[in-house]
């Protein structure tokens, strides 16, 4: 039986997308179109690199309207800057059309607040979504933004935004370190983490090491902080690690994974490795922090001053956080694996194809 032809339109093909697309390719004849390729893994689907033209902040994909005619389904990221993608719902078509995204406009200016006031661009975004045969959101919570609007939520599916992990077991004796994983830039609140860690040492003489995995603009500032505060041997910088097996070793040694002001894909990654994630309740997110049930499988805190107390408590009561880690792992296995993400998307594709 021939598979239906599916084209997924992205800005960038990232490494974390590959495993879910490989899973989707088992059900559909999948092509992924993009204008930037950051993938390194084996791709069991077709790839298509687009020619683009940029005019200011806007992107136009060359010959896109001709390309899409050869597919049964087309699924695009509804980024309003990519004019060619967002024009698709308003053109005559024979193929079924879907969108796949956070679910509403989120940025540093518009954080993940489902109760915020709608503005003109939200109306434009809604028009784009409403003209599609189905929508795929990263998290169930995003539907709340569209309550009491004309968007048909019966045509909205959820594919929990997540990332893959490798099996590492759960050895309580190894789990002692505090861990940060991600790009080192100011938006992550690394300065707040370092300050809280220093305060925790001053308060309780904790001996848990802080391991930082990543690279970026804050790298030299972190080195300077470590030197100025005599934290050599306590704060360990590893640089960027792209090998998942090597990264997994750091999670295997971690009691907590912490990112004060941003909670993205590191949240399900950490949970998948059985490590509670710690971040502010107001952290910048694509919705991933809503995987966390505060105090059960992770920690959400409100004030910066609380973080040092959390680190001290983890040092003094590690069993409490080990139990959280086990619950985090169970949550990931039950709700947030790559297979859950793929099944959510496939359900949307099947629905669109048959309605």
Predicted feature descriptions by range:
Residues 276-284:
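Short hydrophobic beta-strand element within catalytic cores of glycosyltransferases
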Residues 316-350:
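A charged, aromatic-enriched C-terminal amphipathic alpha-helix characteristic of glycosyltransferases
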Residues 240, 280, 294-305, 312-319:
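Conserved acidic donor-binding segment of nucleotide-sugar-dependent glycosyltransferases
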Residues 125-169:
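Donor nucleotide-sugar binding/catalytic pocket of nucleotide-sugar-dependent glycosyltransferases
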Residues 221-241, 295:
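Nucleotide-activated donor-binding/catalytic signature segment of Leloir-type glycosyltransferases, i.e.
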Residues 105-127, 165:
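Nucleotide-sugar donor phosphate/pyrophosphate-binding loop at the beta->alpha transition
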Residues 19, 176, 183-201, 217-223:
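A conserved mid-protein helix/loop that constitutes part of the nucleotide-sugar donor-binding site
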Residues 249-262, 275-276:
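Acidic donor-binding loop of glycosyltransferase active sites
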